Regions:
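Short alpha-helical scaffolding segments that buttress acidic/His motifs in well-ordered protein cores
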Residues: 2, 21, 64, 68, ...
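Short, amphipathic C-terminal "tail helix"
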Residues: 83-121
Length: 121
C-alpha cells in the first residue's frame, strides 16, 4: 500500500511504509499473529510483557507504531499531505501492485485497502 503514496504524493518510500505498516500488520494479524509474536521479543526485548500470542502481537505492532512517533515522523496520511478524497484512488492503484500483494499473508481486496487507508488517515 506504500507505492501509491510515493507515486501520487512523492512521499519517500520508507515514510510511506511507516505510515501504513501498523495498519497493515493489524489487518494481517488474524492470520500472521504467531509470526508477529515470534518477532515481538526481538523488537521489544525486556519491555515485552507476558501474554499470549495476541497480546504479544499487539505489543509488537504498537512498538513499531511508537518508533515512528519517537522518530518524529508523520504518523497519519493527513500529516504527510495526503488529501482524504484521494483514498479511493490510492486503494484502486494499490491493487495494481500484484507482485507485492501476492506475498501478503492475507488476501487484500480494494475494499480492504481503502479501509486501511481510512484508518491510517
Amino acid at each position: 500500500l506504500a507505492y501509491p503514496l510515493g507515486g501520487h504524493f512523492h512521499i519517500p518510500h520508507g515514510l510511506s511504509n511507516a505510515l501504513v505498516l501498523p495498519h497493515v500488520l493489524g489487518f494481517n494479524a488474524s492470520v500472521a499473529a504467531p509470526l508477529y509474536a515470534e518477532l515481538a521479543p526481538l523488537v521489544l526485548g525486556e519491555q515485552l510483557r507476558a501474554g499470549g500470542v495476541l497480546q504479544q502481537t499487539e505489543q509488537f505492532i504498537g512498538a513499531l507504531a511508537d518508533f515512528s512517533v519517537r522518530s518524529g515522523l508523520p504518523t497519519r496520511l493527513r500529516d504527510a499531505g495526503v488529501p482524504q478524497d484521494m483514498l479511493p484512488t490510492l486503494a484502486r492503484d494499490a491493487m495494481q501492485q500484484q507482485r507485492l500483494l501476492v506475498n501478503n499473508p492475507r488476501e487484500m481486496t480494494e475494499a480492504h485497502a481503502l479501509a486501511i487507508y481510512q484508518v491510517a488517515y
